[in-house]
C-alpha cells in the first residue's frame, strides 16, 4: 500500500491534534467529580466507563496522522496500566501537558533533543522525591483506604482488604461475575503459577487477552507433545462431553500446537496449552502439587504412564481456570482434601529437613500455593452495563492496592506531584534547551490537580496556588470541595501508580517532541459493492 509522509512542523501539528483529541476525552474522567464516557460497541449494549485505558484503547481517529498521535498517548496509558494497574488518566493528562508545552518551544526554535534530555533529568528528580515522600502500607485500614479511593466505593475497598487479609498480600485474588446483585468474597482452594498460554489464538477474551475455561479437564504431563495422535483418543472423548481442556506439558510443539489452535478457532472445542512450571526435579514436584489440587495424575514415564493410554479418570478438573500471557490460575480444583493435606505434610517435612536456604524458599513457595487458596471477588450488579463498569472499578482497585503494598503510598488527588515541583525546579540543565525541558515538566506536574479541580467546577490555577502555600500533605478534596490533610483523610495514591504515570508520560512525550517525520498509509478508495442481481443469494 502507498505511503504518505509529513515532515517537521506539519508532522508535529498532526500528532499534537491526535494527542489533544484523545486526552481531552480521557481527562474528563479524572477525580471524584470526573464524568463518564459512553463507548459504542460493535455489538451489544454500549459501555459506560471512567477507566482511562479502556477509553484510550477504544479511540480510532479518521485522520491517520492524528491517529498515530492518539495511539502513542494510549501507549503511555496502557504501559502505566500494565505496570501499576491504575493511573492511566493521570498518565494521559501529564503526556498532553508535556507535549503541548514542548511543541510551543520547538516551534519557537528550541532543540527538541535538548528538551528531551531536560525532561528526562526532571523526571528522575521528581521520582527520587516521590520515593522520599512515600509512606509504607502496613495496616488493613490503609489497604482498604487505597482500594476505596481507586474504586470510589468503601464497600469494594473493604472487600479487597478482607481478601488480602485472608490470602496474604502476595496471595492470588481473582474477579468473577456474580449471579446476583451483591458483590461478595469467597476463598476457595486454588493455585497460580508463572506460565501463560503457548499461543495467543487460544484466548477467549480479546480485550483482556485472557483465556477463561469453565469446568475444564486438566491434562498434566512432564512429556513433550509433538504428535497429536498421542492425545487424539482422549480429545475425542472430551469433545463428545462438550468440555474444555487445559494442557500442562513440558512443551507442545510440531504439528500438535497448530492442530489444537485450528480446532479452537473453528470452535470444535476450547483448549489452552501451557508449559509446566519450574525446571528439573522441581518441575516434577510442582506437577504433582497441581495433580493433588485438581484430582488428576501426572502422566509420566517415571510412573509407567503413556500419553496415548490416558483415560479421562486420570485428568484433573477445576471449576475455573484463567490463563494470561504470563500466568495460569486454577480456581477450586477437584482434588481430595486428604491428597492435598498429604502433599502439604510432605512439603512441611522437607522444609524441616533441608539445610539449603534456596531449597527452603522454594518449598515455602509451594506450600503457600497449596495452602493459601484463591480469594474470589464475585462482582454483582442489577444490569449488564452496570456490571461491566463495576468490574472495571474492582480491577482498578485491586491493581492499585497491590501497587501500594509494593512501593507505599503518597498524598492523593495529584497533591504528590505538586509536592515534587520544588525538587524539579531545583534541578539545573547543562544547556538552555535542557533547562526548558526541566521547566516544562515542573509546569506539567500541576496538570492533574488543575484537571481534578476543573472537573469539580473550580478554577485549577487557584487550587494549585493554594497548595503551594500549605503543608505538603494538604490537598484539594474535590468530592467535598475543601482542603484537607490527604493522608489523615485516607485520600492516597500508590507511589508506584504516580511514578509510572509520570515516567511513561515523559517517555512518550519525549518521543513525540523528537519526531521529525511521520509515515502513514494512504487510504484506498474502495469502489462500492454492486447491488445484488435478481435471483442471487
Curated annotation (Swiss-Prot):
One of its GO terms (biological process) is protein refolding. It catalyses: ATP + H2O + a folded polypeptide = ADP + phosphate + an unfolded polypeptide. Belongs to the chaperonin (HSP60) family. ATP binds at residues 29-32, 86-90, 413, 477-479, 493. It is found in: Cytoplasm. GO terms for cellular component: cytoplasm. The keyword Thylakoid does not apply. Its EC number is 5.6.1.7. Together with its co-chaperonin GroES, plays an essential role in assisting protein folding. The GroEL-GroES system forms a nano-cage that allows encapsulation of the non-native substrate proteins and provides a physical environment optimized to promote and accelerate protein folding. PROSITE patterns: CHAPERONINS_CPN60. SUPFAM superfamilies: GroEL apical domain-like (SSF52029), GroEL equatorial domain-like (SSF48592), GroEL-intermediate domain like (SSF54849). This is Chaperonin GroEL. CDD domains: GroEL (cd03344). Pfam families: Cpn60_TCP1 (PF00118). It comes from the Bacteria. GO terms for molecular function: ATP binding; ATP-dependent protein folding chaperone; isomerase activity; unfolded protein binding. The keyword Chaperone applies. The gene is groEL. Keywords: ATP-binding, Chaperone, Cytoplasm, Isomerase, Nucleotide-binding. Forms a cylinder of 14 subunits composed of two heptameric rings stacked back-to-back. Interacts with the co-chaperonin GroES.
Amino acid at each position: 500500500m502507498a505511503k504518505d509522509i509529513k515532515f517537521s512542523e506539519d508532522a508535529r501539528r498532526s500528532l499534537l491534534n491526535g494527542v489533544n483529541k484523545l486526552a481531552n476525552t480521557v481527562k474528563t474522567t479524572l477525580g471524584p467529580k470526573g464524568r463518564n464516557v459512553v463507548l459504542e460497541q460493535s455489538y451489544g449494549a454500549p459501555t459506560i466507563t471512567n477507566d482511562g485505558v479502556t477509553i484510550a484503547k477504544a479511540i480510532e481517529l479518521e485522520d491517520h496522522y492524528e491517529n498515530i498521535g492518539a495511539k502513542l498517548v494510549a501507549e503511555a496509558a496502557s504501559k502505566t496500566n500494565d505496570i501499576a494497574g491504575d493511573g492511566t488518566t493521570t498518565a494521559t493528562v501529564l503526556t498532553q501537558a508535556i507535549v503541548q508545552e514542548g511543541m510551543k518551544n520547538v516551534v519557537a526554535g528550541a532543540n527538541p533533543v535538548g528538551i528531551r534530555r531536560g525532561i528526562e533529568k526532571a523526571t528522575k528528580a521528581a521520582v527520587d522525591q516521590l520515593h522520599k515522600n512515600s509512606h509504607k502500607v502496613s495496616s488493613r485500614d490503609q489497604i482498604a483506604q487505597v482500594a476505596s479511593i481507586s474504586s470510589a466505593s468503601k464497600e469494594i475497598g473493604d472487600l479487597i482488604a478482607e481478601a488480602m487479609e485472608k490470602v496474604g498480600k502476595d496471595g492470588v485474588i481473582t474477579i468473577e461475575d456474580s449471579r446476583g446483585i451483591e458483590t461478595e468474597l469467597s476463598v476457595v482452594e486454588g493455585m497460580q503459577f508463572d506460565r501463560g498460554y503457548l499461543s495467543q489464538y487460544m484466548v477467549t477474551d480479546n480485550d483482556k487477552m485472557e483465556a477463561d475455561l469453565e469446568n475444564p479437564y486438566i491434562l498434566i504431563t512432564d512429556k513433550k507433545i509433538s504428535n497429536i495422535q498421542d492425545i487424539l483418543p482422549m480429545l475425542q472423548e472430551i469433545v463428545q462431553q462438550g468440555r474444555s481442556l487445559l494442557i500442562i506439558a513440558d512443551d507442545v510443539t510440531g504439528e500438535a500446537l497448530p492442530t489444537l489452535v485450528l480446532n479452537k478457532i473453528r470452535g470444535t472445542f476450547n483448549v489452552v496449552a501451557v508449559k509446566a512450571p519450574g525446571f528439573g526435579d522441581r518441575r516434577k514436584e510442582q506437577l504433582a502439587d497441581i495433580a493433588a489440587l485438581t484430582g488428576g495424575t501426572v502422566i509420566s514415564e517415571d510412573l509407567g504412564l503413556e500419553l496415548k493410554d490416558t483415560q479421562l479418570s486420570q485428568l484433573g478438573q477445576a471449576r475455573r481456570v484463567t490463563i494470561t500471557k504470563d500466568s495460569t490460575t486454577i480456581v477450586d480444583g477437584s482434588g481430595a482434601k486428604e491428597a492435598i493435606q498429604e502433599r502439604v505434610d510432605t512439603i512441611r517435612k522437607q522444609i524441616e529437613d533441608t539445610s539449603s536456604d534456596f531449597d527452603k524458599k522454594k518449598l515455602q513457595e509451594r506450600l503457600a500455593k497449596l495452602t493459601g487458596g484463591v480469594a474470589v471477588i464475585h462482582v454483582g450488579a442489577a444490569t449488564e452495563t452496570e456490571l461491566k463498569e463495576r468490574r472495571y472499578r474492582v480491577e482498578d482497585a485491586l491493581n492499585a492496592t497491590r501497587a501500594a503494598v509494593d512501593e507505599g503510598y503518597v498524598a492523593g488527588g495529584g497533591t504528590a506531584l505538586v509536592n515534587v515541583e520544588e525538587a524539579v525546579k531545583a534541578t539545573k540543565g547543562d544547556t538552555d534547551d535542557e533547562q526548558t525541558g526541566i521547566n516544562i515538566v515542573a509546569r506539567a506536574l500541576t496538570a492533574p490537580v488543575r484537571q481534578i479541580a476543573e472537573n469539580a467546577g473550580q478554577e485549577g490555577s487557584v487550587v494549585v496556588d493554594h497548595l503551594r502555600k500549605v503543608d505538603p500533605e494538604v490537598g484539594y478534596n474535590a468530592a467535598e470541595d475543601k482542603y484537607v490533610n490527604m493522608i489523615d483523610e485516607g485520600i492516597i495514591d500508590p507511589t508506584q501508580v504516580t511514578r509510572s504515570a509520570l515516567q511513561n508520560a515523559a517517555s512518550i512525550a519525549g518521543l513525540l517532541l523528537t519526531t521529525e517525520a511521520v509515515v502513514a498509509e494512504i487510504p484506498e478508495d474502495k469502489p462500492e459493492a454492486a447491488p445484488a442481481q435478481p435471483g442471487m443469494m
